[in-house]
Amino acid sequence: MNPVYSPGSSGVPYANAKGIGYPAGFPVGYAAAPAYSPNMYPGANPTFQTGYTPGTPYKVSCSPTSGAVPPYSSSPNPYQTAVYPVRSAYPQQSPYAQQGTYYTQPLYAAPPHVIHHTTVVQPNGMPATVYPAPIPPPRGSGVTMGMVAGTTMAMSAGTLLTAHSPTPVAPHPVTVPTYRAPGTPTYSYVPPQW
């Protein structure tokens, strides 16, 4: 037992041997400890009852106001599905995607190995780009170039073949360079190709 520390027995008022300025042997101006109250706050509060009666097991009702069990819900999520938009991998099934003229592209995120090995900033946080629906190219009339619509090849071939041809052009003079004779070159150093 430490001789310096000798706790006083219970119920004995504090002697205050060193004269510390406690007025009546108890700090904070109390002559004795305040009486115990089961309520944390003074006064009656209908929401917080005074306490549990001795002998009752500790159990809190699911609905403190009425005591009734809340109604059963088959969904584990207390929020409805359509309250907040969720970006899905299939944007056409989302009620917030534009259904008609424009398709929505899902959010793009590069795979982790691409982000890890490159210094290019990946557009991970960019919103989905909206691009117009593809328009098919216009269908041609099925008529070959040089033919008149409504005719067959046999009808138009005679006109095409007997048409006047321009005057033929004389052949152009071509100069062929003189090449080095085969054999060992006169120089031995070949510069690199890069």
UniProtKB/Swiss-Prot annotation:
Biological process (GO), any one: neurogenesis
PTM annotation (Phosphoserine): residues: 6
Tissue specificity of this protein: Predominantly expressed in the brain, including olfactory bulb, cortex and cerebellum (at protein level).
Glycosylation sites: 45
Topology feature Extracellular, residues: 42-141
Keywords of this entry: Acetylation, Cell membrane, Cell projection, Cytoplasm, Glycoprotein, Membrane, Phosphoprotein, Transmembrane, Transmembrane helix
rRNA processing as UniProt keyword: no
GO-annotated cellular components: axon; membrane; perinuclear region of cytoplasm; plasma membrane
Modification after translation: N-glycosylated.
Induction profile: Up-regulated by different neurotrophins, including NGF and BDNF, but not by growth factors, such as EGF.
Membrane topology (Cytoplasmic): 1-18, 164-194
Membrane topology of this protein: Multi-pass membrane protein
Keyword Lipid metabolism belongs to the record: no
Function in brief: Inhibitor of neuronal axonal outgrowth. Acts as a negative regulator of CDC42 and STAT3 and a positive regulator of STMN2. Positive regulator of CDC27.
Similarity annotation: Belongs to the FAM168 family.
Assembly notes: May form homodimers. May interact with DAZAP2, FAM168A, PRDX6, RBM6, TMTC1 and YPEL2. Interacts with CDC27.
Protein name, entry field: Myelin-associated neurite-outgrowth inhibitor
Species annotation: Mus musculus
Gene that produces this protein: Fam168b
